[in-house]
Amino acid sequence: MDSKRLIIFVLLSVGILFGWNEYFMPKHTPQQQAAKTQATTGAANNVAQPADANKLTRGQRIQVKTDLVEAEIDTVGGDLRSLKLLKHGAAEDHKQPFQLFEDSAKRVYVAQTGLVAASNPALPTHKTVFTSDKPSYQLTGDTLEVKLTAPDANGVKVSKVYTFKKNSYEIGVRYDIVNGGAAPLAPTAYYRLLRDSQAPEGEGRMAHTYTGPAVYTSEHKFQKVSFDDLAKGKGDYAKTTTDGWVAMLQHYFMSAWILKPLDGASVCKDERSCRFELKETAGLNSAAALVDYATVAPGKSLSVSVPLYAGPEEYNIISKLADGMEYAKDFGIFYIFASPLFWLLVKLHGLVSNWGWAIVLLTLTVKAVFYPLTAASYRSMAKMKALAPRLERLKAQHGDDRMKFQQAVMEMYKTEKVNPLGGCLPMLIQIPVFIGLYWALLASVELRGAPWVLWYTDLARPDPYYILPVIMAATMFLQTFLNPPPADPMQAKMMKIMPLAFSALFFFFPAGLVLYYVVNNVLSMAQQWFINKQIEKSNKAALQS
């Protein structure tokens, strides 16, 4: 197998390996999980438990519209039950906005908050019915506040205030507390993201990435816990923190409660006052931050605001929200390679203002950097190709005696100073980089809805006319003629079939990924032709001298 086929084979093999657990391991539907999971009580924190997936109480809906989102806030709990992203089209119908939060019979993904205190069980939770002055709100300036008022809680007055900002997916959630009671109040607030285990809208078999909760702290960094581990009561993550964020991640989009914004102070007053809690209860997965508020003396008031980010995983946005939030972009285990490649892709996009041409320039840059290794590989393959006739003669000479044939071949390699692995090793060094580039493109929401040329209006979707996959197949097939033929007839036949077999997978890949592979193959062929010509020229010069 020549080195180019080896690269493609390893790339696809690793891709299949990464997706194995997600595609072929048993999945738990919310109903199955509900049947087998015993709900934990959380009595230690006295935190209200999530409702059953089919029993989220519905009240009146408050409509909110900004330049970027359409939101629905339910008067029950003041929960954010629906959130549509107006600048991002739905996976199946791009004319409709993508819906991140949803509370319907088929899907549950909401943001909940509440207050609890042992001394005052009447504090508002996600089950309390709030009131609002208006049924709908429209952002007309730079900010918009939506105030919900809770019933009196033994003399304690509580308001829950949402703050929407222009040109922002960040939503402020503030509790205003006035203690009109006779006793001090020490409330704990919970900020929860609640969702079922279903794959997100538009999740494809060829573009499957992580879906589930994650936490980040300055001490323990980025940690993910799968839905399966939550259902089994497993998962290792930071339980206490003084900063960081807790999130629900999926392909291209995320939501997160931020305890310490990048440009602000932490809401945690000491190392024990903030806790993360990830669990599965009654068919729903919960990712929550618990925050102990400062004690509110009688006659005093307190206001605490925690930002909620709910939007795309765009690097230029999330990297400015909180420390470590750039890790939310799922580059897999090849983050160390994918992250700098994505950074370079963003810089190139800044030059050409087109993600398609940025991919072309990125491929050119990567090929230029690795040209010395590629040249060494092709020179080694050219030597192997020159020895092909002698290999055939050795095979005819030794017949079925494979032992003598192999000995003769190794002796020939030694005499001609040829390393049979010389064509593979330089390419093997590049494989992590190419896989990193694969993940950089796969995880980039920036490509979603991004046009290139002609009919390529969305580089995150497959080529609608399959032109790029066909070109991909053609380039792979043509490359077989530029490489030395394998001595084994069966292997030679496989080399003809493999391009067609692998190319079938590219029909389902996002167009941006296929564009990268097409450009990479064309450049590889051009490099190989150029290097072969150089070798032929040097060989002729050596003969003439």
Swiss-Prot record:
The primary site where this protein sits is membrane
Q: Keyword annotations for this protein?
A: Cell inner membrane, Cell membrane, Chaperone, Membrane, Protein transport, Transmembrane, Transmembrane helix, Transport
Q: Which domain of life is it from?
A: Bacteria
**Protein biosynthesis as UniProt keyword:** no
Compartment(s) of residence? Cell inner membrane
Which InterPro entries does its entry note? Membr_insert_YidC, Membr_insert_YidC_N, YidC/ALB3/OXA1/COX18, YidC/Oxa/ALB_C, YidC_ALB_C, YidC_periplasmic_sf
Q: Name one GO molecular function term.
A: membrane insertase activity
Q: Which residues cross the membrane?
A: 6-26, 331-351, 355-375, 425-445, 467-487, 499-519
The way this protein sits in the membrane is described as: Multi-pass membrane protein
Q: Does the UniProt entry include the keyword Transport? A: yes
CC terms in the record's Gene Ontology section: plasma membrane
A Pfam family recorded for this sequence: YidC_periplas
Any GO BP? protein transport
Q: What is the annotated quaternary arrangement, including any partners?
A: Interacts with the Sec translocase complex via SecD. Specifically interacts with transmembrane segments of nascent integral membrane proteins during membrane integration.
The text of the family note is: Belongs to the OXA1/ALB3/YidC family. Type 1 subfamily.
Free-text function comment from the UniProt entry: Required for the insertion and/or proper folding and/or complex formation of integral membrane proteins into the membrane. Involved in integration of membrane proteins that insert both dependently and independently of the Sec translocase complex, as well as at least some lipoproteins. Aids folding of multispanning membrane proteins.
**PANTHER family registered for this protein in UniProt:** CYTOCHROME C OXIDASE ASSEMBLY PROTEIN COX18, MITOCHONDRIAL, OXA1
Note the HAMAP family from the entry: YidC_type1
Q: Which NCBIfam families match?
A: PRK01318.1-3, PRK01318.1-4, yidC_nterm, yidC_oxa1_cterm
In Swiss-Prot or TrEMBL terms, this protein is called Membrane protein insertase YidC
Gene from which this protein is expressed: yidC
